[in-house]
């Protein structure tokens, strides 16, 4: 059975049947009130339920939050019980095996057909363009949230921001926040490390305007893939097609030479003129749990807004963890593990805890084979895409479960001599990190929490870990039910 959801409407119907969605009929304001309700739900055990606010004050369009905010729902949205299976599919695209014999070529055909079937498909019309607004554009007609009291304004937080490389024409779909500046203007938060920022600076160098489209919704994997740290050569909508095993259908923009999902709820078209001065963007209550200050970013001019007849405004709340992004980050962690293992076969597992905002801590377990192996792995991780922004990398032995914070702290505290096992370096840091003296550049820490060898400067005999004998464990297993312990 193939992927069954055509759009968000299909998905939330299924969630409602399974008791995973709550319809809220009470009128609530998009200014702070919807955030407060969502924040409380996100902090419930397991992430809480998806929330559909049917009557946002002053708007006809309902607001959907916390859609991906549990392990169950993110798995359901992507259509996989084991998310690492998606990673292995991505691995086969990036590192294809070249068939050596005719028989191997024949065996490769079904896989090549699946890849071909996943290529995005442009269609003549889609539901997203059922209603068209050009000329008298007003972004304030959309129930865009102001999330936190000191935010600089209302922000679109779950838009798939679509641009094309001005030189190569390669599409990028990224998840960048957008601040409403005026009824037809947005500030685009293109951080320096992101592909959208590269497109902007290329357009500026070439003296061209950069066309932009923002899609809200679509098939459930689409908002996720916009957040995924894919290599620049991998099209996000192709990746979504690989996940669904069918193509993402796209429609051509009405005022821009870009395509966006035909089954999206809402799309916003426009352009950025790199010759214009940058504008103030922020403050914004971010996923770090702190406000990011005002900074300068490009301004987007909106030329059209299109939407379905019955649109839903999908948005996400970010703030002090845990929030919905805990589960989006967890999905990325699981999906990209196979690619990390390909580059570093000694890696057993890794974990980017949401409490560390994904870029503050990386816990990794390895099969240690030689002195200094932990540092070698840490250096390599810092060379992998956005892993370069990690601030603390802690390396453990293969038998430590890095998903278990109790085991992590036990091994870290017992195995580390700060004078010997800690290395301080400098490098790129996430621009949202407020602890560094310079924006985007600061210190990093590598910690070797593995068992130490004499060649690494350890001069004593390393103690054995306490373990019960297997015979006793087996004996107690056999009689456990008779002990009356519940």
From Swiss-Prot:
InterPro entries: HBDC, UbiD, UbiD-like_C, UbiD-like_N, UbiD_Rift_dom. Pfam families: UbiD, UbiD_C, UbiD_N. One of its GO terms (cellular component) is cytoplasm. It comes from the Bacteria. GO terms for biological process: ubiquinone biosynthetic process. One of its GO terms (molecular function) is 3-octaprenyl-4-hydroxybenzoate carboxy-lyase activity. Belongs to the UbiD family. PANTHER family: 3-OCTAPRENYL-4-HYDROXYBENZOATE CARBOXY-LYASE-RELATED (PTHR30108), FERULIC ACID DECARBOXYLASE 1 (PTHR30108:SF17). This is Uncharacterized protein aq_1612.
């Amino acid at each position: 059975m193939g992927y069954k959801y055509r759009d968000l409407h299909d998905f939330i119907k299924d969630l409602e049947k399974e008791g995973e969605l709550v319809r809220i009929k009470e009128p609530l304001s998009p200014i702070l009130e919807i955030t407060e309700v969502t924040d409380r739900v996100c902090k419930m055990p397991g992430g809480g339920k998806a929330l559909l606010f049917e009557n946002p004050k002053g708007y006809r369009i309902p607001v959907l939050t916390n859609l991906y905010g549990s392990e169950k729902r993110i798995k359901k949205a992507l259509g996989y019980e084991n998310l690492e299976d998606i990673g292995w599919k991505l691995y086969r695209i990036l590192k294809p095996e070249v068939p050596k014999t005719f028989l191997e070529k024949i065996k490769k055909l079904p896989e090549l057909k699946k890849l071909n079937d996943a290529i995005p498909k442009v269609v003549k019309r889609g539901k997203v363009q059922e209603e068209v607004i050009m000329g008298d554009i007003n972004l304030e007609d959309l129930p865009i949230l102001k999330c936190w009291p000191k935010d600089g304004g209302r922000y679109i937080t779950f838009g798939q921001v679509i641009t094309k490389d001005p030189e190569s024409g390669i599409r990028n779909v990224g998840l960048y926040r957008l601040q409403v500046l005026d009824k037809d203007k947005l500030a685009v938060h293109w951080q320096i490390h992101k592909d959208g920022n590269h497109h902007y600076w290329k357009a500026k160098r070439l003296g061209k305007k950069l066309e932009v489209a923002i899609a809200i919704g679509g098939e459930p994997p689409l908002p996720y893939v916009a957040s995924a740290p894919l290599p620049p050569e991998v099209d996000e909508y192709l990746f979504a097609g690989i996940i669904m095993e069918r193509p993402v259908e796209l429609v051509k923009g009405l005022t821009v030479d870009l395509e966006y999902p035909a089954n999206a709820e809402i799309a916003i078209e426009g352009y950025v003129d790199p010759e214009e001065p940058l504008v103030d963007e922020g403050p914004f209550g971010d996923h770090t749990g702190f406000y990011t200050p005002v900074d300068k970013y490009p301004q987007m001019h909106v030329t059209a807004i299109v939407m379905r007849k019955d649109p839903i405004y999908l948005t996400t709340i970010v703030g002090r963890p845990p929030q919905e992004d805990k589960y989006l980050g967890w999905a990325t962690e699981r999906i990209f593990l196979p690619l990390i293992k390909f580059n570093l076969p000694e890696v057993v597992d890794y974990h980017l805890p949401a409490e560390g905002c994904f870029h503050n801590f990386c816990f990794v377990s390895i099969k240690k084979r030689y002195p200094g192996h932990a540092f070698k792995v840490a250096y390599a991780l810092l060379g992998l895409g956005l892993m370069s922004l990690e601030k603390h990398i802690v390396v453990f032995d293969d038998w430590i479960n890095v998903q278990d914070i109790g085991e992590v702290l036990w091994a870290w505290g017992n195995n580390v001599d700060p004078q010997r096992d800690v290395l301080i370096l400098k490098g790129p840091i996430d621009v949202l990190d407020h602890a560094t003296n310079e924006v985007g550049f600061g210190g990093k820490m590598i910690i070797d929490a593995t068992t130490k060898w004499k060649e690494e400067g350890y001069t004593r005999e390393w103690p054995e870990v306490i373990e019960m004998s297997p015979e006793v464990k087996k004996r107690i297993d056999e009689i456990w039910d008779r002990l009356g312990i519940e």
